[in-house]
């Protein structure tokens, strides 16, 4: 027995008479006194539980997690990517590898989701709600556990009376206090009296607590050795606090589970509760108030969903309101929308945590709350029905060691029904979790588990062998196979051979399946000959400095940032400055770029270890790469790559033997280098030794991973011709442009022209349709104004659509590429559905935003001081301030060592002259002295970058980056132009666009967008004012191959709807693996396989038109190509491109859709009055020259115009356009027949895509 028990026994022996009198008084008390005694009895039981058994007390870490989640869900504090990263870094700090802690976080989120689903007005924290939901107890009892004592004044008096032996004074103060003392001294007698006199409702809760007290001794034996009183203000745990946060949280969570299981023995097994139970167990209404009734209703309604009803009146277009009734409580439409948004964010967050972090499925708290969630049966019409079931399935089956779960991930990732474009349009908030499956599989593969990697590829190949596999899913699965070959660290040769045999079956399929299978077969054959070659080729292309010869560089260059980024390919982000969501995506890439960029030495170390794992099956424990100097690592890496490249083209058996022999000899050299470095360190003084050890530990080998790409962000100022006159009109097309945006593109392209080799230029447009149209205008203006800027450049455009804005060009790409739909569009949108809430426009002030960040930072600092051991804290405090001083004090010795190493290496190279040796030594010493300061700063930052918490924003950025790496197909879209004249003929300019032009009700309503956004009810009133246009139309009709046939005039007609759609050609670019061969060999391969699109277009034009004096040179080239297709290559200069050009089977064409309207009623006549034409050009002019009209071009409003012309934009007809600008009446049918549709490759805009879905 403890000291507290002894003191209580003494007080019991001294006050027997008082106890008997008080017991008699208890029997004669009225109902009010009985209620008071009952509450005091419960308080005394809690007090004895705390004093006698040292019961569970909630640790600060668990409380902090609850507070962080509560703030992030309800207060909507997130306003930037940095704040988002701070939240996740704080939440998962030192808890990433703790499965029980992740399970607890998921349990808290599920609790909040159930509260919102049942429309409960919870005024307490998530931890309180979870406790009351699991135990059917009151919140006050939770506060007793939280505080370690009673919460009212009577409990404080009881504690004082138990600690003091002066019972006479306590009897004189108050009779109620004396009765409470008697209850504390005689628990058994008082409990019997209370059972006879008090109500059953109050006794039910008291009996549950007494049962827990009876079993508390068993809990003490399990947790007393590991549990400590751990608060933010305690200072008594200096020697015993030397445990990691995972240990602390483990003890915390185990104690929480034990307290729940012991406190609520009957409530854990929810299956034992009958669904037809008339009255659930009640709790004390005096302690919980009205909130307890809500919990009672929840427990009674969890088994059935009959009380959750959705009542709608009318249709969505009507003005009637929608009522949502849950448990008899009606909600407004705004409250419904807010609740749905929060529930969606909670489910998405749970899905992210369960897929990217290992949790304990057997965690008692999680098992109970999942069981309660499974009892809720949602209707299929509910907002989150599909996501609810999907998250529940993940939580019930998540076990990454189980093959069934890996099969589930591959099945869900390749499921194209969930990522259907129609579903994405109808409900933009569903199925956002599907974009997380592929990163989750990639994370499993990077764990370097041979069994898991083998299981993933076996399941993937099993899908590809299925005879009933749809064609759409085949392309997605092939792309998954290609993607996993890039990221997997180790892959057995047997798996590669089985993949070769399966992919060969798709080689004979038509395009694009056969082309894609050929590319994958090339990758697999290279992997079989030289394991890891695909990864090393991509790494060398993105990081050219990693392949530099060690003879041409010094040790100081390896730590130089300029040398690291030398010749790295750059992704140029064209960001819409006036789009807040575009700026958010820019911040997403900028915030995660510097954090996850390793050094050259680190990449080389990772590569060396991975090659030894693939070939010899040994890791760094048998190598010791961390003991090598950076220059030695570079030398070893260069030798190993030389061996791998030389043995690639030998026979399989011979290459394996030579490769193993050479790698063993290089391993012996590594050991020698390690011995030399250790001997040299032993000869140095103590300060120098500590400095060298800190340098050695910087490049410990890690799992292979491609670093972030190199980015450049260029602000583009979007322009509205309708509201603001442009800075300049580009001649001869009079394209409206912005001078600053155009100047930025000129500077960027000029830098590429200064280089001596051909390049790919990758532009990533971040924005919506307005951004695309603005950049397209500047791009075309430069192509016609300064064509020398595009010489020998392969221009590619990537579309990164903003989260909530409409982007029609992104929808078009999604219709061709399911990977783009799933892993780019949905992945970006998922950022808005993960807590903390991420509104496009923050409603918080900067002061509130900063206070939130500071509060979370303080919590993280507290957990940091709690989590780390005292020894580790002292080491960090000593090393961090001393490390720069040690390096600065030993600059001279470090430089001398570098000079000696370089001289030894340079003497072995007989081909180098003495002058070059001296120059190298001087350059290395000067570089070392100038970069010593920068080196010390990077070492202090790399300590924080060793194991950063992977946030959702970093996962999204990484997933989008693979679009820039692996897109081997290309969607080539011909550019359209709309020439418009106002009422005054001098008001002329040209608007380029890509997809669609329309004149209908959408065009009319677009002019009142501001009014509709402020008051949506004005749509019906505005529709009554719509008046169809009466126009004259002239079209150039063509056949299905795009060959012009004849001109057709349609005079004086009124059309309700006019649409012009750009029809995509039914062929795409041929995919091929990026090779390291010279440009000449790649161009010759192009000639042997395919011809260019320009040549075929020219031939068709010559066969049909027969005239065209302006294109004689092109005709001659085309005739030569007909005779010798294998010898000539007169296409565009895209030699360095990895996207080979294929034969375009048909010329570009447009589809015209006309819907005639009654002139008097202004309505559509019938469905029979819809006319469709395949055309090459169209002219429209208003009959009344005083009336003007507007037009929508790719969703952007332009006008007003009196006359327009729409045709394809070709460089061969610039003179005609220039003449048309001067005189609008000079254009006729003969002018359009000259060189019409004679497009070159540079007249197409190339959009690289991952997989191509053929047009039906």
Curated annotation (Swiss-Prot):
Start-end of Polar residues biased regions: 222-243, 1069-1079
Biased composition (Low complexity): 147-214, 898-916, 925-942, 1080-1136
Region (Disordered) location: 1-53, 145-243, 898-951, 1069-1136
Gene Ontology terms: biological process: G protein-coupled receptor signaling pathway
Source domain of life: Eukaryota
A molecular function GO annotation: 1-phosphatidylinositol-3-kinase regulator activity
GO cellular component: phosphatidylinositol 3-kinase complex; phosphatidylinositol 3-kinase complex, class IB
Protein name listed in UniProt: Putative protein DDB_G0292252
Organism: Dictyostelium discoideum
């Amino acid at each position: 027995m403890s000291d507290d028990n002894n003191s209580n026994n003494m007080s019991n022996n001294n006050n027997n008479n008082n106890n008997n009198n008080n017991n008699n008084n208890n029997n004669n008390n009225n109902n009010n006194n009985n209620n008071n005694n009952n509450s005091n009895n419960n308080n005394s039981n809690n007090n004895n539980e705390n004093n006698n058994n040292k019961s569970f007390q909630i640790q600060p870490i668990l409380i902090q997690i609850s507070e962080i989640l509560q703030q992030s869900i309800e207060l909507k504090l997130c306003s930037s990517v940095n704040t988002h990263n701070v939240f996740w870094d704080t939440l998962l700090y030192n808890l990433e590898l703790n499965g029980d802690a992740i399970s607890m976080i998921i349990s808290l989120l599920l609790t909040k989701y159930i509260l919102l689903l049942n429309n409960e007005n919870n005024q307490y924290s998530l931890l309180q709600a979870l406790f009351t939901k699991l135990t059917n107890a009151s919140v006050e009892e939770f506060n007793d556990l939280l505080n370690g004592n009673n919460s009212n004044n009577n409990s404080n008096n009881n504690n004082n009376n138990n600690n003091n032996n002066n019972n006479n004074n306590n009897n004189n103060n108050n009779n109620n206090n004396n009765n409470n003392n008697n209850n504390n001294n005689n628990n058994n007698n008082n409990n019997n009296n209370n059972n006879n006199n008090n109500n059953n409702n109050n006794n039910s809760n008291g009996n549950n607590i007494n049962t827990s007290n009876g079993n508390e001794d068993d809990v003490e034996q399990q947790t007393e050795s590991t549990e400590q009183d751990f608060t933010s203000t305690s200072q008594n745990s200096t020697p015993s606090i030397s445990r990691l946060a995972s240990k602390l949280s483990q003890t915390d969570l185990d104690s929480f589970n034990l307290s729940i299981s012991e406190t609520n023995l009957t409530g854990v097994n929810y299956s034992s509760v009958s669904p037809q139970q008339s009255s659930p167990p009640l709790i004390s209404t005096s302690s919980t108030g009205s909130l307890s009734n809500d919990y009672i209703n929840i427990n009674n309604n969890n088994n059935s969903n009959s009380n959750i009803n959705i009542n709608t009146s009318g249709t969505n277009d009507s003005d009637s309101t929608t009522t949502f009734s849950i448990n008899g409580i009606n909600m407004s439409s705004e409250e419904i929308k807010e609740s749905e948004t929060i529930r969606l964010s909670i489910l998405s967050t749970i899905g992210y945590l369960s897929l990217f972090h290992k949790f304990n499925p057997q965690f008692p708290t999680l098992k109970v709350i999942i069981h309660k969630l499974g009892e809720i049966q949602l209707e299929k019409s509910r907002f989150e029905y599909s996501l609810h079931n999907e998250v529940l399935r993940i939580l019930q089956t998540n076990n990454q060691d189980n093959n069934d779960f890996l099969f589930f991930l591959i099945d869900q990732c390749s499921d194209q029904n969930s990522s259907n474009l129609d579903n994405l349009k109808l409900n933009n908030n569903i199925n956002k979790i599907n974009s997380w499956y592929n990163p989750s599989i990639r994370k499993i593969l990077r764990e370097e588990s041979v069994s898991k990697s083998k299981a993933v590829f076996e399941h993937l190949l099993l899908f590809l062998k299925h005879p009933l596999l749809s064609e759409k899913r085949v392309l997605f699965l092939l792309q998954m196979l290609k993607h996993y070959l890039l990221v997997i660290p180790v892959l057995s040769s047997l798996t590669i051979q089985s993949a070769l045999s399966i992919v060969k079956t798709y080689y004979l399929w038509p395009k694009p399946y056969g082309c894609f299978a050929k590319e994958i077969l090339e990758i697999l054959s290279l992997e079989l000959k030289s394991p890891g070659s695909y990864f090393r080729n991509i790494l060398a292309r993105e990081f050219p400095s990693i392949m530099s010869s060690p003879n041409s560089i010094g040790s100081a260059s390896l730590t130089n940032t300029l040398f690291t980024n030398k010749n790295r390919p750059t992704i140029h982000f064209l960001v819409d400055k006036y789009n807040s969501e575009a700026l958010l995506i820019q911040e997403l890439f900028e915030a995660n770029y510097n954090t996850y960029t390793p050094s050259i030495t680190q990449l080389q170390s990772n590569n060396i270890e991975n090659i030894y794992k693939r070939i010899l099956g040994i890791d760094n424990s048998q190598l010791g790469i961390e003991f090598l100097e950076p220059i030695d690592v570079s030398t070893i890496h260069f030798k190993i790559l030389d061996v791998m490249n030389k043995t690639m083209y030998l026979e399989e058996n011979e290459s394996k033997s030579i490769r193993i022999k050479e790698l063993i000899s290089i391993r012996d050299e590594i050991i020698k280098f390690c011995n030399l470095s250790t001997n040299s360190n032993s000869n140095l003084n103590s300060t120098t030794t500590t400095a060298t050890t800190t340098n050695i530990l910087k490049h410990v080998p890690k799992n292979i991973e491609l670093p972030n790409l190199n980015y450049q962000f260029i602000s583009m100022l979007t322009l509205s011709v309708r509201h603001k006159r442009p800075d300049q009109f580009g001649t001869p097309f009079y394209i409206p442009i912005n001078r600053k945006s155009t100047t930025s593109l000129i500077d960027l392209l000029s830098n590429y022209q200064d280089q001596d080799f051909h390049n790919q230029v990758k532009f990533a447009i971040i924005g919506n349709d307005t951004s695309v149209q603005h950049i397209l205008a500047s791009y075309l203006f430069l192509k016609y104004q300064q064509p020398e800027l595009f010489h020998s450049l392969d221009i590619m455009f990537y579309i990164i659509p903003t989260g909530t804005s409409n982007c029609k060009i992104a929808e078009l790409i999604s219709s061709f590429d399911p990977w783009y739909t799933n892993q780019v569009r949905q992945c970006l949108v998922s950022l808005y559905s993960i807590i903390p809430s991420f509104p496009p426009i923050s409603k918080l002030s900067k002061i509130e935003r900063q206070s939130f960040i500071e509060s979370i930072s303080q919590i993280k600092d507290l957990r940091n001081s709690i989590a780390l051991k005292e020894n580790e804290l002292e080491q960090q405090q000593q090393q961090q301030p001393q490390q720069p001083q040690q390096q600065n004090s030993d600059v001279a010795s470090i430089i001398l060592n570098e000079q000696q190493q370089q001289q030894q290496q340079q003497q072995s190279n007989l081909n180098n002259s003495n002058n070059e040796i001296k120059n190298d030594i001087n350059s290395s010493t000067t570089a070392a002295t100038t970069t010593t300061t920068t080196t010390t700063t990077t070492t202090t930052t790399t300590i924080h970058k060793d194991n950063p918490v992977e946030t959702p924003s970093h996962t999204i950025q990484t997933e989008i980056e693979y679009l820039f790496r692996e897109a081997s197909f290309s969607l080539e879209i011909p550019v359209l132009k709309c020439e418009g004249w106002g009422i005054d003929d001098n008001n002329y300019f040209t608007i380029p666009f890509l997809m669609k032009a329309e004149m209908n009700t959408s065009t009319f309503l677009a002019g009142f967008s501001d009014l509709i956004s402020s008051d949506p009810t004005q749509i019906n009133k505005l529709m009554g004012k719509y008046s169809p246009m009466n126009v004259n139309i002239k079209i150039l009709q063509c056949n299905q191959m795009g060959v012009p046939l004849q001109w057709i005039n349609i005079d004086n007609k009124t059309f309700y709807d006019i649409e012009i759609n750009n029809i995509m050609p039914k062929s795409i670019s041929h995919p091929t693996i990026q090779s390291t061969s010279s440009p000449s060999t790649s161009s010759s391969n192009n000639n042997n396989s395919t011809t260019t699109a320009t040549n075929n277009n020219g031939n068709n034009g010559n066969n049909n038109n027969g005239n065209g004096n302006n294109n004689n040179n092109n005709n001659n080239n085309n005739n030569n190509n007909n005779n010798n297709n294998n010898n000539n290559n007169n296409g565009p200069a895209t030699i360095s491109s990895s996207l080979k050009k294929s034969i375009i089977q048909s010329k570009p064409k447009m589809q015209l859709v006309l819907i005639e309207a009654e002139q008097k009623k202004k309505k559509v006549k019938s469905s029979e009055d819809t006319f469709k034409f395949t055309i090459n050009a169209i002219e429209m002019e208003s009959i009344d020259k005083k009336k003007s009209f507007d037009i929508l071009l790719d969703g952007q409003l332009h006008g007003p115009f009196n006359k327009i012309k729409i045709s394809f934009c070709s460089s061969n007809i610039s003179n005609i356009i220039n003449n048309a600008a001067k005189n609008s009446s000079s254009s006729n049918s003969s002018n359009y027949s000259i060189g019409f549709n004679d497009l070159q490759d540079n007249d197409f805009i190339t959009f690289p895509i991952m997989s191509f879905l053929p047009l039906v």
